[in-house]
Amino acid sequence: MDLTLLLHSFTPSWTSVAMLLGYFTYLAIFGSILPGKVVPGATLSDGTRLYYRCNGLLLLFLLVILLGIGGWMDLLSPTAIADRGLELLSATLVFSALVTNVLYIVGCKSHDQSSSLRPHTTGNLIEDWWFGIQLNPQFMGLDLKFYFVRAGMLGWLLINLSVLVKSIQESNLSQSMILYQLFCVIYIMDYFIHEEYMTSTWDIIAERLGFMLVFGDIVWIPFTFSIQGWWLLRNKVELTIAAIIANCLVFFMGYLVFRGANKQKHVFKKNPKALIWGRPPKVIGGKLLASGYWPFSGASQGTVTISGTCW
């Protein structure tokens, strides 16, 4: 590809910027008003805790329906994301940097002494910008950390669906594309069905919100996790029946281990005395779970990693 053409493809247009801002606005507004299970987060060092409205699945369904209606009425193109993928990538990257700058400035100026908003600085500008200043910064009552990871997961689905439609329009739909889309939909739907599990993850509990998390959530997740779909759009790969069965078996084996292990971890963090496989949990160092799937975590993680090759 010509370098000039490549650079032009990465240059955000006003359309791509509007698409991005519209998407984030939708998540902010409807994420605040749609009903959902309110889940308490971990108890922080000052004894306080945040509460999270887990309505991501409803947000997903509503957005897909709205986009479907918009496409049916010719108000928008279902391939708009696939057509402007590089533009949206660069626009989101710039957006993540701008958000991080605001978080850094606001965090440094904060005099709040609560666990969520107390500034944590090292004196190293790059380190503080990268790892963040505040644990749980908010904007107009919106918990930004929870918001961004939701945006990344849902954005991944939207990219995939747009690529799928483009593949159909170009008569380039393959068994590999169908399997990839199916596996991703299962994983993403599972995430939102069990969205409350996110409240007990290290990212939410302990990581401050800086460029590492902002970039990871809204750039890395949607744009790198969808690489397989982009590749299959231009490279039609047909599979034998045996290959399809093998891919499905490995995927579902990895998925079941992943889901079971993460459920055990979530239950343990919420209640350290909860039974794991009918037995009291074994713990290493007071915090590390060594029951259920977790004594075999190395093998389990390896299986899950191998299952990722099926995508």
Predicted regions: what they are:
Residues 1-294, 298, 304-310:
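Membrane-anchoring alpha-helices and their flanking helix-loop junctions
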